[in-house]
Amino acid sequence: MSYNDRKVIGRCVMKEQRFKVSFNSPVILGFAVICLIALILGLITGGRTNTMLFSVYRSSMLNPLTYIRFVGHIFGHAGWEHFMGNIMLILVVGPLLEEKYGSSNLLFVILATALVTGIANFALFPRVQLLGASGVVFALILLSSFTGLNEDGIPLTFILVAALYIGQQIYQGIFVNDNVSNLTHILGGLVGAGLGYVLNKKKLSRY
């Protein structure tokens, strides 16, 4: 092989490496895509798909869609601003957590958060239509604070994040009137904290 041939091959390899895209976080990227599709459908249908599939509220237990909405509500968003606020945080925090805990564990955290927050809203707030990934966002935030867990004890970062976060939600729930479900944030954070503790303890027990 001549020098020129090697040079051409080297350039081709460099081009392939330069433009290579890594699908590094299938659960988080898949979640973001589903949320985007749900948002577009909601905008096209004037919110009817959100009411049908992507929000949770008190409805008949005989309706099969009621059970789909227990999970589906985390994919729905009221508009682009609502969507971007949640998805940007998920795309920043989520891939690091998926790399640390694995795709199946992170998927379990997301589904557990959806079920806990969905059932809580269904049972406690019959007149509230809940939608959005904010519960998942706070679950991932609290889960990320457990990344430093070791055999010496609970990391100080978790204590600080939990105290500031829970304090903020309690304050907003008492003194601030808005359309955000503070209970959803708190429950999502508790799910993330609880599962983060369990997942890290299991990981430590292997060593």
Protein language model features and the residues they cover:
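A detector for small-residue-rich transmembrane helices and their helix-helix packing motifs
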Residues: 2-207
